[in-house]
């Protein structure tokens, strides 16, 4: 999404509120657009799907997807 102050904080808090651990994060910014890749530790698909739904509701988040299995 568009780069905005506090984006990493908002995403990290959202993940934490779902009782999910962040294993790693990689963020790149190109022309005021930020792309964040999180590796998270979840207990099951239900927890992951709930996290994805919550993340998509954050300010200026355009897209959230599961990258791998």
Tell me the role of every PLM-derived stretch.
Residues 1-69:
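A conserved regulatory-domain signal marking ACT and ACT-like small-molecule sensing domains
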